[in-house]
């Protein structure tokens, strides 16, 4: 009876091993796969199996745990497998699984290190399924590590191995990767599939009217008839080609003509109308502009009925936050609307609503991008007390910590008299005791300071940093530190501070800016940001559908480089400058 049981056990083990392996070749070894047995059954059998058989069983058990979402257990089981003693097929399986587990921990570098294994030279000899699995995780790891072009190249490599839904998913991933590349990396140097993808992305990113962009895509297809993307366009381009090229003939400009926002509305209106005048001067067919007074609105639905009856195709405005909130909670709007403010909700509003403003949150994100591009890791933050400072800090924290950075200290500033103590606390400044001539010590783990403050406060902060032995710590600020007043004494007090700012205030040679400041001198100062926003609202008006169809597209405006989020909010990326010798010195743009 015992002999029979042993024989039965042997047969079961053989069947289980057969279910756990496929055999590419005798030299490569058997490739594990997940059988119908449970993890516990696989591990139980592995405990009494021969070493090679046990390794197959444990690899299958680890793979099954990973597929069930138990990454910790998968890693624990995988750790019991002696990878160096395995045959190449099993090694590739093991390092692929190890890379997948590393990505669940958001550790792209560990994933790439795992895949940098000698056995990978045999990958092309394995079944297609394993080639696809290994190359897919490598592409994901490269993308997570910021190696966007290499990730696209890896996905292009496996594209011929795929079909059906997998092929479509991979093709959309390739498109998203090449569209994330900066323009200088889109210059195709070959006629292979990668070169075709790069030139298609360049065509899609080249600014122009809807008609021009559609023609650029058609020209690309004619030049690359056998390219995979010509046979099946990415979904974004399908949407773009299906947009109706309908001219925009009439815009309603909805702004308050009385109340506390009159001066803001005036600057927006003058910037908007100046942009229309410039378009007419350059020979463009400009839409008619009809101005409506939002301060007189008692019923927003009545306004839309009036606008529709007047033949309006697009509403630009309102500016008032309460009216934007009303629009944001509606299911539909009668007309496409570019609001000149943001609702408080982060959720998308009705499909016809777009929101645009000079959000301080955009600038907080810009500081995070810049500091990250400059290779910095640990931040301290100085923001004003109150709701505005809390919002700016929250936006910076979300972006900075989301990208792997750390915030070591936060100070909420208010009164200049308290700055010395606040900065001393932030840097944990310690006195030199009784040692004559010794320099006080401070913490050394702060790479830079994120600053959101008025010019008057900022010009107190930088000298105080110098006094508190922290003058060499870089300061990255929002535009709020810049008064654009030309006050050299103030600029000297802020020497070394880097800040993001609108092109309007930094590029003083811009033709539209020169026209506007000649007529309205106040536009040369801090109020110029609103003139820039008004001009950009005109620029955005005919291109909203394009930005919606191609979220990676950007419009180079005077308030920043403009793109659209998934919630149809216009987001700005800004150029940079630095206070230097009582002047404002333009810095190179942030690498994107």
Locations of regions flagged by a protein language model:
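Beta-alpha junction/loop-to-helix N-cap segments that form part of ligand/metal-binding clefts
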Residues: 264-268, 282-345
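Alpha-helical protein-protein interaction scaffolds
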Residues: 33-238
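Bacterial Sec signal peptide processing site at the extreme N-terminus
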Residues: 16-36
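Segments of small-molecule ligand-sensing domains
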Residues: 518-586
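Short beta-strand elements in bilobed, periplasmic/extracellular small-molecule ligand-binding domains
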Residues: 279-294, 350-354, 401-422
């Amino acid at each position: 009876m015992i002999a029979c049981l042993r024989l039965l056990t042997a047969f079961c083990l053989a069947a289980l091993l057969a279910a756990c392996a496929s055999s590419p070749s005798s030299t490569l070894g058997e490739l594990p796969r997940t059988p119908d047995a449970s993890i516990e059954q696989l591990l139980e059998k592995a405990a009494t199996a021969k070493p090679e058989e046990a390794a197959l069983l444990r690899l299958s058990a680890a793979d099954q745990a990973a597929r069930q979402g138990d990454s910790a257990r998968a890693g624990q089981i995988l750790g019991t497998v002696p990878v160096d003693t395995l045959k190449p097929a099993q090694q590739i399986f093991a390092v692929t699984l190890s890379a997948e587990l590393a990505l669940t921990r958001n550790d792209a570098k560990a994933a790439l290190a795992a895949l940098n294994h000698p056995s990978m030279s045999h990958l092309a000899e394995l079944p297609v399924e394993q080639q696809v699995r290994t190359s897919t995780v490598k592409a994901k790891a490269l993308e997570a590590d910021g190696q966007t072009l290499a990730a696209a190249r890896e996905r292009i490599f496996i594209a011929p191995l795929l079909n059906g839904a997998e092929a479509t998913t991979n093709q959309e991933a390739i498109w998203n990767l090449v569209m994330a590349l900066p323009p200088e990396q889109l210059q195709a140097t070959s006629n292979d599939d990668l070169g075709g993808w790069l030139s298609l992305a360049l065509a899609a990113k080249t600014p122009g009217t809807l008609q021009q962009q559609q023609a650029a895509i058609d020209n690309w297809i004619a030049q690359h008839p056998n390219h995979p993307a010509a046979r099946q366009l990415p979904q974004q381009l399908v949407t773009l080609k299906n947009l109706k090229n309908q001219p925009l003939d009439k815009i309603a400009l909805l702004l308050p003509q009385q109340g506390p926002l009159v001066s803001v509305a005036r600057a927006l209106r003058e910037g908007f109308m100046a942009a229309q005048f410039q378009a007419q001067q350059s020979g463009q067919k400009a839409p008619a502009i009809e101005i409506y007074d939002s301060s007189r609105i008692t019923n927003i639905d009545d306004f839309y009925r009036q606008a529709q009856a007047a033949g309006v195709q697009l509403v630009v405005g309102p500016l008032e936050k309460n009216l934007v909130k009303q629009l944001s909670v509606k299911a539909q709007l009668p007309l496409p609307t570019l609001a000149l403010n943001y609702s408080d909700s982060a959720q998308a509003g009705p499909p016809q609503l777009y929101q645009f403003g000079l959000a301080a949150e955009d600038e907080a994100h810009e500081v995070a991008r810049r500091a990250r591009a400059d290779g910095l890791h640990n931040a301290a933050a100085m923001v004003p007390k109150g709701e505005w400072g809390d919002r700016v800090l929250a936006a910076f924290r979300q972006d900075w910590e989301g990208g792997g950075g750390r915030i070591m200290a936060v100070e909420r500033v208010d009164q200049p008299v308290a700055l010395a103590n606040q900065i001393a606390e932030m840097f944990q400044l310690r006195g030199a005791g009784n040692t004559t001539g010794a320099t006080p010590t401070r913490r050394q783990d702060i790479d830079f300071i994120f600053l959101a403050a008025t010019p008057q406060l900022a010009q107190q902060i930088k000298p105080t940093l110098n006094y508190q032995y922290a003058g060499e710590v870089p300061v990255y600020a929002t535009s709020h530190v810049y008064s654009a007043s030309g006050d050299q004494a103030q600029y000297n007090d802020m020497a070394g501070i880097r800040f993001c700012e609108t092109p309007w205030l930094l590029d003083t040679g811009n033709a539209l800016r020169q026209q506007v400041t000649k007529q309205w001198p106040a536009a040369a100062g801090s109020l110029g940001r609103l003139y820039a926003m008004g001009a950009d609202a005109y620029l955005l008006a005919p291109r909203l559908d394009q930005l919606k169809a191609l979220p990676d597209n950007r419009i180079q405006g005077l308030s920043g480089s403009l793109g659209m989020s998934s919630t149809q909010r216009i987001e700005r990326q800004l150029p940079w400058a630095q206070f230097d010798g009582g002047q404002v010195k333009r810095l190179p743009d942030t690498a994107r």
